[in-house]
Amino acid sequence: MSDEDWQVSRRLFAVLQGGVYSAMLYISSLPEMEQDKCKRSFKKRLSEKETGFIFRLRKAEGIRWSFHTRDYYIGYVREMVAGSSLPDSLRLYVYISNPLWHQSYRPGLTNFNTEWPFVNMWIKTGFMWDDIESQNICKGGEISHGWGPGMVGIVIKAFSCGERKIKITPVMIIRGEIDPTEWCGDCWNLMCLKYSPPNTLQRLAMLACGKEAKEWRGCCNQRFVSPFRTPCDLEVVQNKPKRNLLWTGEL
C-alpha cells in the first residue's frame, strides 16, 4: 500500500467511527476514481463490524446459525418467512416487535422468551454499526443503562416447523416413551443439540434415531426497504446447515 493509499484508508476509518452518513459524505467528496476503492473498503469495514457484533450476541445465546436483518424505520410488527413452502420443510419465522411496545417492558437476553428454539437479535433505531464499541447495548444478559424504552427492539421466534419441541433424553428413547420419527429432521436435530452434550456418542446416537434432515433452500421474497443499507442487510439463510455442524455444535 502506498503512502497516499494509507492516508486515504486511515481517514476513511476515522470517518467511519463517526457514522455511516459521515463516511458516505466523505466518499462522495473524493475524486471519482477514488470513490469505488473507498466504497469497497467502507463496505468491508461495515461488514466486519456487523459480523463481530452479531457473533458476540449469537455466542451469548448459543445460536449456531440465524437469519438477521436491520431496519432503520421500525414502526410496527413485521413478519418475514424464509424457507421452502413444501410440507415438513424447515421455515424461519421472524417477528420484529414494535419498540413502542416496550414502554413498560423491555425484555433482556435472560427473560424475553421461554419457548425454545428461538432466535433473537437486537435492533436499534439508529445504525447498528455507528461507533459500535462504545454503544454497550447489552451487559450481563440485560440491556445496559442508558438505552431507554423504544430504543431497542428485538427479533423473536424460531427457525423450525410448527411441531412442539420437548426436552429429550436417551433414556426416553430407550424406554420407548417417545418416537423420534414423529418430528421432522430439522426439529429433531435442534432438540438433540439442546439436550445432549457436544462431541459425544450420546448425541450421535440420538441424532441417528431421528429422520434425516431434508435439503432446503431459503426463498424469501420480502425485503425491508430502507435507504440506509449495506449489502450485509440482505443476508438471509440460504442453505440448511450441514449435519457435521449440527453434530459438533455446542449450545
From Swiss-Prot:
Species of provenance: Feline immunodeficiency virus (isolate TM2)
Gene field: vif
Keywords: Host cytoplasm, Virion
General function of this protein: Determines virus infectivity.
Localization in the cell: Host cytoplasm; Virion
Segments crossing the lipid bilayer: none
UniProt entry tagged with the keyword Cytoplasm: no
The keyword Magnesium is annotated on this UniProt entry: no
Protein name: Virion infectivity factor
Main location: host cell
Cellular-component GO terms for this entry: host cell cytoplasm; virion component
GO biological process: viral life cycle
One Pfam family cited in the UniProt record for this chain: Lentivirus_VIF
Entry's family note: Belongs to the feline lentivirus group Vif protein family.
